[in-house]
């Protein structure tokens, strides 16, 4: 019984230990002053001037080492394992641990079931619950705070509270109620440029790139693939990422615009005195270096008899008296001897000079190089320098080439160190190897003291001198008369950032528990002795600001009462009044002390754990109202074409990876990735299979095929110079004759041989290979040709009345009967019959030849029309040819002696006669055969 009571008292006393108070065991009798110079073990502070336990630690009862941690709020049913860190029974760690619940919970009632309470013990409901009395006691019902909440976005009611959520593109502010715009650009969703907007963002690309169909990536623009009329380079174009590079063919060089090319001679032309302004000195005569002959330097003439140099050509050094000629330079060297009467002694006669150089009115051709004042290179001391280049010359001079002129001056030296060494041995600029200090040169790494400053130590490093003076430690004055760098300083002590005079006594830890003394520059501290206690260790109490433990007074019977709802908490009880960020403790005097924890948002999308004060960034992310774990990927709600990942409370989104297998993919609306079906050609959609022409190239025809675009030049129809007619009608006898239009035409003789019909491009529809012939029509045409060759020798027979109404032999799909579309009227008995119609033989061999008379023309008109169609019909395709074997065809042709049997042997289809087989008049028929 007593053991349980003592244990209960110990649980109450331990949480009352403060971080600023210390308890020490094993002290000597009161009145005994002990100066402990050093304390051994871990967690010891003030080592060297006395020692004590660091804040948050206390000496243990056995060894006296500082190994007993102190927890300010107590650990309840847990164990204090570090300063203000408790290890609870459920394995969690925190500033405190909940008390072990018995029949009643933390609030005096079991709130785990229906949020109820115990009427006899306490009547309390947590914040967010409404207390109601029932027949079985107190019941706590959840309050829907969303009915009157101040959420700017969407309110979600929870048990005991509510949570505010924001829509897409917005995030919750620090007040947990209002919404603010989410800067999506921080997650780098765009490849190049990103512009944030309220609830959204927009990607763009730099110059030389265009936005991909996914609206996030940037694709390089190939400037070199433009048509010839819009090409960017004069000669050759090389595409680069985001730009392009132009090059020129041999003999040309790029102009300043880096796009066009100009002619450039292979030989180096030296600037000449005659082509320079009056105010500029001459540098070199007009002399071109050739193979086997080097160029001359200014002020030097070629040696006598030197090979490769023409006689009389030399360099000059006197100023020029001739103005610049606004003409182009000659590209050939003038190798005429210089006469003695020449004012400069460098060039040939005026006639040769004028012919070679030109006059002011001479045009400047595109292949002529431009030199003189506008030249982009310089010739100096036998070398060529580009315009804008600088170089050093012997004698500490620096030269500059600018627009063909060389300007030399003194070398400008920029010192890169504080103490450079002056130049030696003909040098131009000082050196930073070594130091020049106080009139003396110091070697690299030399340590020295300046004159009259023995207490100052300097070092030379890379031309810089750094000096330091020794800092004299405090201490008593020395009796030695020898002078040194440090002066005599009275004894002082420096302790915890403050100086104390010799003999001063002060508190070491900011309280009265430690006493320190400054003696001869050293601090000695000792702890205040504590009396021995007669009460057991469990009843020790260390009050605020006290140095020694005292025995606990009898515990008062009352704790901390809350007047609003009648709840009473025992002394030392820690609870949260409803907000997990606020903790309250019941003090020993019955007062309640509450402290609120301020949370700092360390990530944009933390997770709020119920019952936990601050959001947690390590558990995952809360994004668009959903919770994601770390390293979890998910599609973006703002843009389905983005893939996002959660990383420690932060969300990073990037475009979905789209595999593209074609050159011109088209990105349909609402799709994340472009597809290789239609084409996106120069920003416009081209349907698959569509043929189109370029806007600036009407003669170029392109076609879109599954995301690829291929172009070709449209072939133009050649002029008709040698027409030909199909040979499937009947044999022609051709001869050349001029056409009325001045073209070379042909003449075709008809079947009787007495009429020549002129043939030109308009009368011949095209070569017979335009469409394949059908076997049946071709066979009938051959039969007609055979009968036509014997028609002149055939004797007339008595007219045979054709009473059969059976159709003639017809190919499949072609009706050989009367035309349906434009059938001519039947001729009357007295009307003349066309000679051609009267000479047509029967269609089948073995049938008697019957001359056509006016009486029989009406009955035989269908047969004649069919024969005429066979002579002029366009061959059909093989797909339209009737299915018939050669055996069936030969059997039909050899056993049938009438058109009725032929028509019965072959299939007959009622298809109409083609448009081109319709015969209007006999005259028109003869003109087309």
UniProtKB/Swiss-Prot annotation:
Gene: Vwce
Alphabetic keyword roster: Calcium, Disulfide bond, EGF-like domain, Glycoprotein, Repeat, Secreted, Signal
Cleaved signal peptide residues: 1-21
Ranges where the record places region Disordered: 291-317, 339-374, 731-774, 791-861, 879-929
Subcellular localization: Secreted
GO biological process, one term: cellular response to virus
Species of provenance: Mus musculus (Mouse)
Protein name, per record: von Willebrand factor C and EGF domain-containing protein
Comp. bias (Basic and acidic residues): 743-755
Domain named EGF-like: residues: 70-98, 142-180, 181-219, 220-262
Any GO MF annotation of the entry: calcium ion binding
The organism's place on the tree of life at top rank: Eukaryota
Record's compositionally biased regions (Low complexity): 339-353, 889-903
One Pfam family it belongs to: VWC
Function field: May be a regulatory element in the beta-catenin signaling pathway and a target for chemoprevention of hapatocellular carcinoma.
This protein's record includes keyword Oxidoreductase: no
Carbohydrate-modified residues: 454, 464, 787
InterPro entries named in the record: cEGF (IPR026823), EGF-like_Ca-bd_dom (IPR001881), EGF-like_dom (IPR000742), EGF-type_Asp/Asn_hydroxyl_site (IPR000152), EGF_Ca-bd_CS (IPR018097), Growth_fac_rcpt_cys_sf (IPR009030), vWF_C/EGF_Fibrillin (IPR052080), VWF_dom (IPR001007)
Polar residues bias: start-end ranges: 791-807
Coiled coil: none
PANTHER family reported for this sequence: VON WILLEBRAND FACTOR C AND EGF DOMAIN-CONTAINING PROTEIN (PTHR47333:SF1)
Residues covered by the VWFC domain: 376-433, 433-494, 491-552, 558-618, 619-677, 677-762
GO CC, alphabetical: cytoplasm; extracellular region
Disulfide bonds: 146-155, 151-164, 166-179, 185-194, 190-203, 205-218, 224-237, 233-246, 248-261
